[in-house]
């Protein structure tokens, strides 16, 4: 086991604080509408330029191991805020730095660290409750656009695009961010259910100009197995041919004789048919086939429960108004499924989202909800260079998370004003003893830090503006972008309540633990063992 280095008390806390400040100082320059960019060197390719707090935090690794422990703990604050709300990472870092700095001063002055932490926790619980009181629902498109604009560093076009996307696919719809082809940002909306499986044979294509298969008013056969024997499908094919409608087959796979026969029938015009593989794998594939069945009012042929493909009739098939199949995707538009049954299916999937602990599963389940409930919107980010593209994509992604958080829990006045108002409301809060009272004051003083940092980044005097905002009431605050005072909500400066709440909770949680630190242990650096000495001239080894 490697030897360890141990530091105690003030010596340990000073080192830890140095690490906290190095990381937080690098992150906090990005806060607010006039926050600056940070350039991150990469081992290959061009450097990355970002204004995203968590991206900056993740890059920082310090040589001094004790300092690094402090930095890593604050990095955890930014990561947690990012996971919970997708935004507010810089605010969380600024709050954590303020609480740690103020708290460690109190510890150095002889206060009990455990009581300080209890006081901080008490203040944060009260502050979260007060934030919920101040919160207003984010109901209309205008408010959604404003939240997106603020989060995307005052880029109004991004805010409007996100609001438009939410309007088109609904609050539960999936909105993804991709690289665009040109210089402008674009919004593409996919109506209906789309999954990433294309046609199994190019001979199914009936629209050569677009390279797609289009089926109008088709039947849909869903099969949870590989189909290779055409005899199994003959009853269904005959029924569809008599009805004079096209057919889409969605199966685990269609191969060999079955695929060849379908292609021949299509080319001869006997029956208009197309086949695609079912989306997903394993249990997820079965679940998605059931989703398609719900959407199209059809059934899935599942051999596990004794159903046979030969016995399938037209009543077992789903219906939709239109289906478009490209090389990569299949889109089912206007399935004829019962709205009440679809809604109950969505509720069931939402319950699974609540219960799952896996981020990957949660993401896949949310995609399924979106496909059933609304649709999919794609924001294509345009930029002149790859470096700008990466930076812009990160901002759009942050803005998207912020707007989702705003829809979920509402909005409060932005620009750090909400926390200042909460701190003023809690001025009379008291703990069980004097040390807890100091902890409460530490937390309340830290709540001013985001406002002060926004003002500092705008090149103004923090104390003057912080006092002016504190003397105001309600949503009165300072717009660092226009350098004017006024009603923050009226000026469109909004923060999602969830983002502000998460930032405060995670910052206080980790900062509270750091204040109560008394000892730090790390591995000593290994001493390099010297190389073997030169053997020199050995006796009797001379040349003859």
UniProtKB/Swiss-Prot annotation:
ATP binds at residues 30-33, 51, 87-91, 415, 495. It comes from the Bacteria. The keyword Cytoplasm applies. Keywords: ATP-binding, Chaperone, Cytoplasm, Isomerase, Nucleotide-binding. GO terms for biological process: protein refolding. It is found in: Cytoplasm. Transmembrane segments: none annotated. Its EC number is 5.6.1.7. GO terms for cellular component: cytoplasm. GO terms for molecular function: ATP binding; ATP-dependent protein folding chaperone; isomerase activity; unfolded protein binding. It is an enzyme of class 5 (isomerase). The keyword Repeat does not apply. Belongs to the chaperonin (HSP60) family. Forms a cylinder of 14 subunits composed of two heptameric rings stacked back-to-back. Interacts with the co-chaperonin GroES. This is Chaperonin GroEL. It comes from Aeromonas salmonicida. The gene is groEL.
């Amino acid at each position: 086991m490697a030897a360890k280095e141990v530091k105690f008390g003030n010596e340990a806390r000073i080192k830890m604080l140095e690490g906290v400040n190095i990381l937080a100082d690098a992150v906090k320059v990005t806060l607010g509408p006039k926050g600056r960019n940070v350039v991150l060197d990469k081992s290959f390719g061009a450097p990355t330029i970002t204004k995203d707090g968590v991206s900056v935090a993740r890059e920082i690794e310090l040589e001094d191991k004790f300092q690094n422990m402090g930095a890593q703990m604050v990095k955890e604050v930014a990561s947690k805020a990012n996971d919970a709300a997708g935004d507010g990472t810089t605010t969380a870092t600024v709050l954590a730095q303020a609480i740690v700095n103020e708290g460690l001063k109190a510890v150095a002055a002889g206060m009990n660290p455990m009581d300080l932490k209890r006081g901080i926790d008490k203040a944060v619980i009260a502050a979260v409750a007060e934030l919920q009181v101040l919160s207003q629902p984010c109901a209309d498109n205008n408010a959604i656009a404003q939240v997106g604009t603020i989060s995307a560093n005052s880029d109004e076009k991004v805010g409007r695009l996100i609001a438009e996307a939410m309007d088109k696919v609904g609050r539960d719809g999936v909105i993804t961010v991709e690289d665009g082809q040109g210089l402008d940002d674009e919004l593409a909306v996919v109506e209906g259910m789309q999954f990433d499986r294309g046609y199994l044979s190019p001979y199914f294509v009936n629209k050569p100009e677009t390279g797609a298969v289009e089926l109008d008013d088709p039947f849909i056969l869903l099969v949870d197995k590989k189909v290779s024997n055409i005899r199994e499908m003959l009853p269904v094919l005959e029924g569809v041919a008599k009805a004079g409608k096209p057919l889409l087959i969605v199966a685990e796979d269609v191969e060999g004789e079955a695929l060849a026969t379908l292609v021949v029938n299509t080319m001869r015009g006997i029956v208009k048919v197309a086949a695609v593989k079912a989306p997903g794998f394993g249990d997820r594939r079965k679940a998605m086939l059931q989703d398609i069945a719900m959407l199209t009012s059809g059934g899935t042929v599942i051999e596990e429960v004794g159903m046979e493909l030969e016995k399938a009739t037209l009543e077992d098939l789903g219906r939709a108004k239109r289906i478009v199949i490209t090389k990569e995707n299949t889109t089912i538009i206007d399935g004829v499924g019962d709205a009440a049954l679809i809604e109950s299916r969505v509720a069931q999937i939402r319950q699974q989202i609540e219960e799952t602990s896996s981020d990957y599963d949660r993401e896949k389940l949310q995609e399924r909800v979106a496909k059933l409930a609304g649709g999919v919107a794609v924001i294509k980010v345009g930029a002149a260079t790859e470096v700008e593209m990466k930076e812009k994509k990160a901002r759009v992604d942050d803005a998207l998370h912020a707007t989702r958080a705003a829809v979920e829990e509402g909005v409060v006045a932005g620009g750090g004003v909400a926390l200042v108002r909460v701190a003023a409301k809690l001025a009379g809060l008291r703990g069980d003893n004097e040390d807890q009272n100091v902890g409460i004051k530490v937390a309340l003083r830290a709540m001013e830090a985001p406002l002060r940092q926004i003002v500092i980044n705008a090149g103004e005097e923090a104390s003057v503006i912080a006092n002016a905002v504190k003397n105001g009431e309600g949503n009165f605050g300072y717009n660092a972008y226009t350098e004017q005072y006024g009603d923050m909500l009226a000026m469109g400066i909004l923060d999602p309540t969830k983002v502000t709440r998460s930032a405060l909770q995670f910052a206080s949680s980790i900062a509270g633990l750091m204040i109560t630190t008394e000892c730090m242990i790390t591995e000593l650096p290994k001493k390099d063992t010297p190389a073997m000495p030169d053997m020199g001239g050995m006796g009797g080894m001379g040349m003859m």
